[in-house]
Amino acid sequence: ADEAQWQEVANQALARFGKIHMVVNNAGVGGDIGPIENQDKKGWQWALDVNLMGVVYGAKIMTPLIKEHGEGGWIVNVASMAGIGGGPYLGAYTATKAAVVALSESWAGELEDKGIHVSVLCPAFVQTRIHESERNRPAKYKSGSAHTPDEGSFTNSTKQMVDNGIEVSIVGRRVVEALEDGEFYIFTHPNYHPVMQERNAAIDAAFI
């Protein structure tokens, strides 16, 4: 979530590899979890700065470096199934991941004629350490949000689903496969397809 740090990463990558052809914007914190009225500005700002602005800075810094050599490249933004269809108590997380999906769609159209492909990865539950992100929350983002009993139950259930999710290596292989096939949307959990079909059907019906 720091533009200067992204510039340092770019400098290190150029020093090591000479050119940059691909960037994977992978950042995710849960933000405050709970009812709308319990989520304060600091929790929202944390999610916005990491989940959204981290992606923005990554593309802003790296895209000119990919354009510079004229050989084309790829930007992969990591969103979430939550960014396609939000769940309860996860307002900040779902909003920022939805923004990543929308940004990816925008950038894909913008960069296509520059030879730069854009893809957006939307996984569901994966065995990551996202629930440990709270301990790394900087002091300036510490909030006073109170946890409700319902929220605590929801948090515990989502942690269990993360712990029982697919392995990261499976996601990695899926991404490689998708890039080889030139896919824009990258999904890792086929069992969510019916949920997406239902959502899309509701949207289609609203246009009638």
Predicted regions and their residues:
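Substrate-binding pocket helix/loop in short-chain dehydrogenase/reductase
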Residues: 34-36, 40-45
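SDR active-site lid
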Residues: 113-186
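Active-site helix of classical SDR
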Residues: 59, 96
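Residue(s) in the substrate-gating loop at a strand-loop-helix junction
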Residues: 80
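The beta1-alpha1 cofactor-binding region of Rossmann-like NAD(H)/NADP(H)-dependent oxidoreductases
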Residues: 1-8, 41
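Active-site loop immediately N-terminal to the catalytic Tyr-X3-Lys motif
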Residues: 37, 87-91
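Alpha-helical segment proximal to the catalytic Tyr-Lys
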Residues: 64, 109-112
